[in-house]
């Protein structure tokens, strides 16, 4: 048997219950709304074009023809260069992903030139010295099907 009185001495005394004021529910609701307003938004903005602080801003008065792609590498508009045209090579995956999404949306909207615009844009993002990759032996073989415990209906 243990020493019951020593056990009682080590425990902290119980706190008395505090009375809740009448407007406590209002205060709880306000703190809940504050929590919602402080929460960071879920949307994220991804910059595709690199921002170089050392280069000057593009001239506002000069007109650039974006459809032909003539002004993208010009010194007049240094911040308007496309991906991969700067001094450092950056990953191009976000740009290609956005272009493919845009291409998938255009036929639904009724754009007649949607099929024509994609190959021209894709050729701009490829490096001039590299040829398109040949399909390797791993890509030629069909993918192995996943064996599921239940048959698919």
Curated annotation (Swiss-Prot):
Biased composition (Low complexity): 67-78
Pfam families recorded: Bclt
Tissue: Preferentially expressed in the testis.
Region Disordered, annotated ranges: 1-24, 65-94, 125-153
InterPro entries (UniProt xref): Bcl-2-like_put
Biased composition (Basic residues): 1-15, 144-153
Protein name according to UniProt: Uncharacterized protein C20orf144
Organism: Homo sapiens
